[in-house]
Structures are given as C-alpha cells and as structure tokens.
Regions:
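Segments that shape or occlude catalytic/ligand-binding pockets
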Residues: 81
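Extracytoplasmic cell-surface/polysaccharide-interacting catalytic and binding patches
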Residues: 1-78, 86-179
Length: 179
C-alpha cells in the first residue's frame, strides 16, 4: 500500500516561476490543448503541484539546464489525483488501448505510480528563443506499441535522429545530477 503524502508536503510550482527557469503548461487543465489526448482531466484553474522533494530536484535541474544549455524547463504534469487518473483511464482512447495499463505501463491504475503522490513529472524544454526542443515525441506520447522497435518515445528507439538522441542525453541526467 502506498504511503499517503501529507498535504503540507505538496507545493505548487507557480510559486517559483519568477525565480527559476521554468514555464508551466498544465496540458490536462485545458481540454482543447493540442497535446491533451484525454479531454477534461483537471479543472481549468488547476495548479501544477508536486511533492516538495521532487520540486527541489526539478528546480535544481532547471537551473543546471538553463546554465549549461540556455534551456527553460516546461512543466506539463505532476501531481495527478486519483480522480484525474480515473478520468484518463475511462476515456475511449484508453479503453481502445488496454495494453497501456499493462507492463511496461503508459498509464498507472488510479492511485498507482508516482503521479498521485506528486513524485512524477512530465516535462519538455525550450531554447533561449522559446523554441521547442525536439525530443522526438510529445511529452506524453502513447504509441500503439510499447517495445523499443516501434515506439518513438522509447529510450532505445532505433530510428531516432542524432539531434533527438543528443537532446534526450542532455535532458536525461539533469534531475539525477541535481540531487
């Protein structure tokens, strides 16, 4: 059973947008957002929040990414309440792709995974001209296939371009190195 996270361990990221190179683009708060494949998940006034430990690592990683690459970290999703996960799983898209709920999972069952505890974050990045950095797929890419050979979001996808491979290599270790 997962441990319940105390409310005071969850903080909204928007408290830090003036002091850190982060931008918030809470995709699932806008059913018309071009990257939102699930429709209405959060209410329009939702705030992107996360566990204080993840928040610290994310902000430090954003500083390193900005200092070393000139990139701004774009935060797409983090704390996802059980009700929101349930709404995602009940969408026709997920119902048509039940394998997304099997290992390796694209989506966790309601209450499972890091999102309901604010311990998972979905990100993208922009360069100093606010241009999107190409990582090969949208931040939440749901392929019909989960294996590396057929899923462009997979870390070992063999057909990714050198630029995408390089961008992923730059972003990948930043959170770990921020600890």
């Amino acid at each position: 059973m997962l441990k319940i996270i105390p409310y005071d361990h969850i903080l909204p990221f928007d408290l830090f947008t003036d002091d850190f190179p982060i931008k918030i683009d809470l995709v699932y708060a806008n059913p018309d957002h071009p990257e939102n494949v699930f429709g209405k998940v959060y209410h329009p006034q939702a705030r992107l929040s996360g566990h204080i430990d993840l928040l610290k690592v994310t902000l430090l990683a954003a500083m390193r990414l900005y200092t070393q690459q000139g990139w701004t970290l774009v935060l797409k999703d983090c704390l996802r309440p059980v009700e929101a996960q349930t709404r995602m799983i009940e969408t026709p898209l997920v119902q048509a792709n039940p394998h997304w709920l099997e290992e390796p999972r694209f989506l966790s069952n309601p209450g499972g995974g890091g999102h309901p505890r604010g311990m998972a974050i979905d990100v993208a990045a922009q360069d100093h001209r606010a241009q999107h950095i190409d990582f090969g797929t949208a931040f939440d890419h749901f392929s019909s296939e989960t294996d590396a050979q057929h899923n462009p979001a997979h870390r070992l996808f063999p057909q990714m371009s050198d630029a995408v491979r390089s961008n992923r290599a730059i972003l990948g270790p930043r959170p770990i190195n921020a600890i």
